Amino acid sequence: MPTVREATYDLFRKQGMTTMFGNPGSTELPMLQDYPDDFEYVLGLQEAAVVGMADGFAQVTGKPVLVNLHTAPGLGNAMGAIFNAQANHSPVVITVGQQARSMITMQSNLTNRDAIRVPHPYVKFAYEPARAEDVPLALAHAIHLASLPPCGPVMVSLPMDDWDVEIDAAAAQLVIDRQVSGRAGADPVQVTELAARIRDAKNPIAVAGPDIDAAGAWDEMISLSELQNLGVWAAPATGGGRLGFPESHPHWRGVLPPAVGPVGETLKDHDLVLVVGSSVFAYYPNIPGPFLAEGTSLVQITSDPDEAARAPMGDAIVADVKLTLTALLAELEQTEREAPPAWPGPSRVEETDPVNASLILSILAEQIPEDAV
């Protein structure tokens, strides 16, 4: 019969999750005992950096990635980075060591009290399995949920004495062999109606959000902008680090001001606002004003049902962003609308003494590979 440890690593292997980022302590060492030769462990010295590396790794690979943290202190240190991973829609699967089961009730040293509550509200799922035998299924649950739209971080608390427990091989294999797919396209009727609204608009504009990048839909968003001569703003204050449209493109307009009044003022000359891959909107600070000018309508495309439900105005299509844009492009032809004025691109940052951060980032941007995160 396999142990919990053996079944768990078989599960990770089946899901292609053979790179683990972590900063372990004593409660995590039993999990790492007999660490498989085909796995890599990327050690960090602070938990926020560890989760940040995993977040970037998930963005590059498009797959769920493992993070290994040390009970309550490690999870607490990582919370800011977990917030960013949530904003980036990154499928980060966090395992957190827990005290031995016989010691939890006494709240012995290193017990993670209320472990499930600690990471909320910045994870999609937090769980501590009731039995050692449930560990592989709990981890599979977390992995699949992290990977379903909208992707995001999850956490499983794992007691340190679970790993050598033997479990039923057949039941474990059923869990290991499962595959879950969650990409769903938009209702074709809604896509056709949206295409007609874009076609009929006199002066439409687009707002690009981070879910475009998360869905791998940059090319589709660029094609839509060029096919319909849409200027493209970046959604304001989304958190995280993803961009939905290249800042070097001539249709780029910049980043929307994040407050209610300024957003409405910025978009007032447009009769249709198409928001793709973003909430509507992450407003801040509190500068009142009309959400939209009279005569301006808004349509949102998002994979996140909560983003769609909480928007204060406009219509919403909840579906995979890439699939929806692909279907929308098939409904549209090259517009005769005039192209927006070309964006000249960012100006060169002047050298200062002391040196400023913008100059450093500009120099780094010129040197790093194009596929760097």
Regions found by a protein language model. Give the residues of each.
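Structural signature of the thiamine diphosphate
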Residues: M1, G16-T19, Q59-I94, H120-Q173, ...
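Anionic-ligand anchoring segments at beta-strand to alpha-helix junctions in alpha/beta enzyme folds, i.e.
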Residues: T18-D55, G97, A186-D187, A195-V273, ...
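Short glycine-/acidic-enriched loop or helix-start segments at secondary-structure transitions
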Residues: M31-L32, M53, N77-M79, I104-T105, ...
